[in-house]
A protein has these predicted regions:
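N-terminal transmembrane-helix/juxtamembrane module of multi-pass inner/ER membrane proteins
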Residues: 1-64, 74-95, 112-123, 127-131
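Hydrophobic alpha-helical transmembrane segments of polytopic
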Residues: 15-22, 65-69, 171, 175-178
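Ordered, helix-dominated protein-protein interaction surfaces in large eukaryotic regulatory proteins
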Residues: 26, 64, 68, 77-85, ...
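Generic local-structure boundary detector
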Residues: 30, 35, 39-43, 69, ...
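Membrane-embedded catalytic cores of phosphoryl/pyrophosphoryl-handling enzymes
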Residues: 60, 97-191
Length: 191
């Protein structure tokens, strides 16, 4: 039986970093490419305003990024709701009671697969009781991997000006390690 832990990487941090870092990387990279005159395409007219090519590129890459994030989330949610694996802290959150009134600590229930039960923990919220069945695939892991791999691949394709190649590789490695840390934290949090 594993205890319930709050998430090491909270939802706020996950979405702030997951959306923020790739977007910052795209803005900075496209602006630098424009300043170094690597993209000398014509400007677009929009309601009488000239839209620089680097802003057009940002719009394109933001769209690709957000579409991919939505697809990743949809795929993860389909997996979560169709498989519905119990989280490792299921017993401490639910404290299941069998139809005969026994619980999991009763020796009669050892080494039995039990499908019919009710949760006896009155203190658990409806949200927590719902989430105890949504262990796999990990939403935190899939979202962080998608966003950070996208950022790393984006930098690989677009950050190709002369200068330090080590900076690009350091940023790519840092992005991937942040996603890896998030995935590992789900294991240590028993999520």
């Amino acid at each position: 039986m594993h205890p319930f832990h709050e998430s090491t990487v909270t939802h706020d941090v996950l979405y702030s970093v997951g959306f923020g870092l790739p977007i910052i990387a795209m803005v900075v990279t496209e602006f630098i490419r424009w300043k170094l005159s690597m993209d000398n395409e014509r400007e677009l007219k929009f309601y009488g305003y000239d839209i620089p090519f680097w802003v057009q590129n940002l719009y394109k890459y933001f769209g690709i990024f957000l579409f991919g994030a939505a697809c990743s989330q949809l795929t993860t949610d389909i997996g979560k709701y169709s498989i519905g694996r119990l989280r490792p802290h299921f017993i401490s959150v639910c404290q299941p009671i069998m139809p005969d009134g026994t619980n999991c600590s009763n020796p009669i229930n050892f080494h039995r697969y039990i499908e019919v039960f009710t949760c006896g923990n009155e203190e658990s919220s409806k949200r927590r009781l719902k989430e105890m069945r949504l262990s796999f695939p990990s939403g935190h892991s899939s979202f962080s991997m998608y966003t950070m791999v996208f950022a790393a691949l984006y930098l690989h394709c677009r950050m190709n000006w002369k200068g330090s190649k080590l900076l690009k590789h350091f940023l790519q490695f840092s992005f991937i390690m942040m996603a890896w840390y998030t995935a590992l934290s789900r294991i240590s949090d028993y999520k």
